[in-house]
Amino acid sequence: MAAAGAASNPGGGPEMVRGQAFDVGPRYINLAYIGEGAYGMVCSAHDNVNKVRVAIKKISPFEHQTYCQRTLREIKILLRFKHENIIGINDIIRAPTIEQMKDVYIVQDLMETDLYKLLKTQHLSNDHICYFLYQILRGLKYIHSANVLHRDLKPSNLLLNTTCDLKICDFGLARVADPDHDHTGFLTEYVATRWYRAPEIMLNSKGYTKSIDIWSVGCILAEMLSNRPIFPGKHYLDQLNHILGILGSPSQEDLNCIINLKARNYLLSLPHKNKVPWNRLFPNADPKALDLLDKMLTFNPHKRIEVEAALAHPYLEQYYDPSDEPVAEAPFKFEMELDDLPKETLKELIFEETARFQPGY
């Protein structure tokens, strides 16, 4: 009987893990179950070539346009990015023909845990909070320098290993920044995880500007300080109410930035709220951490701190080194917007994008 979570491979075909075939041999062997993603299973495996254990994500996206889109975005972006604080793609395994391709296996560095799991079990020291925040912002500086927005930064998308290295993952919702087309109506549905969503997403923004990611990093910093999410909204408007309950009512100047009248009138209809002092919410926190938190969790996206200024903030001074905070070689361009392409076309693009890993390529 195979151990729980271990793989069985009696006949030399694909290894089976919890009833799922993992067709990744002969290079990758000794599979062990790690967890389940939105559209696939993740296992660790031994890499026979590099003699290390790696993570392998099995993705089966081809039945759904949205899953194809996210898979293609993730692959396109991660193959072009190269940075210590962003998870890379080491290898991609798929069938040799498009007709046979039902799954895609993405091989990445094995990271022991993520910030979500860590915060469920550990109180972080100020030193750990400072070092994790520095690495998040160092990775984000590179992402933003490529003119890309992550748009789904949250603790479970920050991978960690035992030496406290941090890598940002999951670029399935990423976009090229497009401030000129950021405006939308009041309460348009938005996909990223609600608790880490900036207030303008609820009001009048598509989340196409870099300030959207900075807000999420502020939410993550607050969560590291207290081991609980700062704005755990139960639904769309509740999310906004949580934010205003701590930040207080927006100023007239901040209201003037909200072009959408429905959104502005909604805010004006709410009773006045005072800002809650950060040191009352986080009495044990380093005052410098709270100063940076305040600059990230700023209601008005135009006044929110940018990533370079955040890195240069006194709280991160022991790590700050602009000469060791690399930027992307060139801004990222999606030749085409993927949103409207049919899944058959997206499958062809995924097939092409992964060809470089095929034997004899």
UniProtKB/Swiss-Prot annotation:
One of its GO terms (cellular component) is cytoplasm. Activated by tyrosine phosphorylation during the M phase of the meiotic cell cycle. Dephosphorylated and inactivated by DUSP1. The modification Phosphotyrosine is found at residue 190. Residues 28-316 form the Protein kinase domain. One of its GO terms (molecular function) is ATP binding. Expressed in the central nervous system, kidney, liver, intestine and the hematopoietic system. Also found in heart, muscle, pancreas and lung. ATP binds at residues 34-42, 57. One of its GO terms (biological process) is cell surface receptor signaling pathway. Transmembrane segments: none annotated. CDD domains: STKc_ERK1_2_like. The modification Phosphothreonine is found at residue 188. It catalyses: L-seryl-[protein] + ATP = O-phospho-L-seryl-[protein] + ADP + H(+); L-threonyl-[protein] + ATP = O-phospho-L-threonyl-[protein] + ADP + H(+). Dually phosphorylated on Thr-188 and Tyr-190, which activates the enzyme. The TXY motif contains the threonine and tyrosine residues whose phosphorylation activates the MAP kinases. Belongs to the protein kinase superfamily. CMGC Ser/Thr protein kinase family. MAP kinase subfamily. This is Mitogen-activated protein kinase 1. It comes from Xenopus laevis.
